[in-house]
Design a protein with these regions (language model features):
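A ubiquitous short alpha-helical element
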Residues: 1-8, 131-135
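Conserved aromatic-histidine-acidic binding/catalytic patches
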Residues: 3-10, 89, 157-165, 253-257
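Amphipathic alpha-helical packing elements
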Residues: 8-48
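Short, charged early-sequence alpha-helical segments and their helix-coil boundaries
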Residues: 33-39, 45-75
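Short amphipathic alpha-helical segments
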Residues: 34, 161-172, 257-265
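Long, low-complexity, Ser/Thr/Gly/Pro-rich intrinsically disordered segments that act as flexible linkers
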Residues: 81-126, 133, 141-145, 276-309, ...
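Aromatic/basic-lined ligand-recognition segments
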Residues: 190-323
Length: 323
């Protein structure tokens, strides 16, 4: 150990124990300010940075002291009673592609259940269709004539396992789109694409897999009243995004471009978090261009979707606010 080595705080007891105990007492998730206060009030021993790594070796790695709010939302399901997320995919089949899809799914090693034609499912899937290469009338008609559909589900996962699960589903979707399935609906995001769109996502994955996952697995933006938000980032082990019309206006965005700007901002932030997320902390600022106004990110729990819903994000939401 060098006498010049940086000293860092080591909470005693560990920070994850303090945060979990407070959540249990309150009976609800902690806010960013509450997390930071518990961290700031914690009794700590100052140790060399290399020593902290040695202390944690072979034990549960504690919450990142310097980035407690973000790291707690990312890992809280490991320490409290909570629903763990899964990737859930609906595969609609019929015609010549049906036996090929069945074989692909049987060999996938995933949790697969088979179900018969469901008229209500047709409306459900079509209502979730994205605008990327919209399905034509023929494809929509084929969806309505499906004879069988499959519910494909991953094992529940924590944040550090999410990306591997989603990459596995990306490869599965590529194979099913070529079979072809009649439609593929990613229920964990409330999102269905046309087969042409799924093939485009697969082509993008060959060049940039992270960009393909953000583009194909995340619904953005969804509008509710004057709020725009994303859905599906939990499949990548990350929080979703939420921004208000008033914040978009404060950045200088014209009302007719609110949806487009929210989509572009969410996509850029999603890609940044996937590729360089370890650098991100609550309070960091973002902008799409040098000329556009900046927004800062504040972490909070997911409140607009029920916890038992497959679209619920246990890793939280990043609310974007005027700088």
């Amino acid at each position: 150990m060098s006498f010049d080595e940086e000293l860092v705080p080591l909470p005693v007891p560990p920070l994850h124990i303090l945060l979990a105990a407070q959540e249990k007492e309150l009976g609800r998730p902690l806010s960013e300010s509450e997390i930071n206060k518990i961290r700031d009030d914690a009794v700590c021993v100052m140790v060399p940075r290399s020593k902290r790594a040695t202390v944690e070796e072979g034990k549960i790695v504690d919450i990142d002291f310097e980035n407690a709010a973000i790291d707690w939302h990312k890992r809280r399901i490991e320490f409290v009673e909570a629903c763990w997320p899964s990737v859930v995919l609906y595969v609609l089949t019929g015609g010549a592609g049906a036996p090929v899809c069945r074989e692909i799914l049987n060999e996938s090693g995933l949790d697969v259940s088979r179900r018969d034609f469901d008229k209500g499912l047709t409306k459900h899937v079509i209502s979730q269709m994205s605008g990327i290469y919209p399905a034509d009338k023929e494809e929509l008609s084929q969806i309505a004539r499906h004879t069988t559909y499959y519910v494909v589900r991953s094992q529940p996962f924590k944040a550090s396992e999410a990306l591997a699960q989603s990459k596995r589903f990306l490869a599965l979707i590529r194979a099913l789109a070529e079979a072809p399935a009649l439609s593929l609906s990613l229920e964990s995001a409330g999102l269905a694409h046309s087969l042409a769109a799924w093939r485009a996502v697969s082509e993008l994955a060959a060049q940039d897999e992270l960009a393909a996952l953000v583009s194909g697995f995340v619904a953005m933006p969804i509008r509710f009243e004057d709020i725009y938000y994303s859905c599906g980032m939990h499949m990548l082990g990350l929080p979703d995004f939420i921004i208000s019309a008033s914040t978009l206006s404060a950045t200088g965005c014209a009302p007719e471009r609110f949806a487009e700007t929210a989509r572009d901002l969410f996509h850029e932030m999603g890609y940044f978090l996937l590729s360089e997320g370890e650098k991100f902390q609550a309070g960091h600022t973002f902008s799409l261009t040098r000329e556009s106004g900046k927004v800062k990110a504040q972490i909070e729990s997911c409140k607009h979707i029920a916890e038992e819903d497959v679209r619920f994000n246990p890793f939280g939401m990043l609310r974007l606010l005027p700088e």
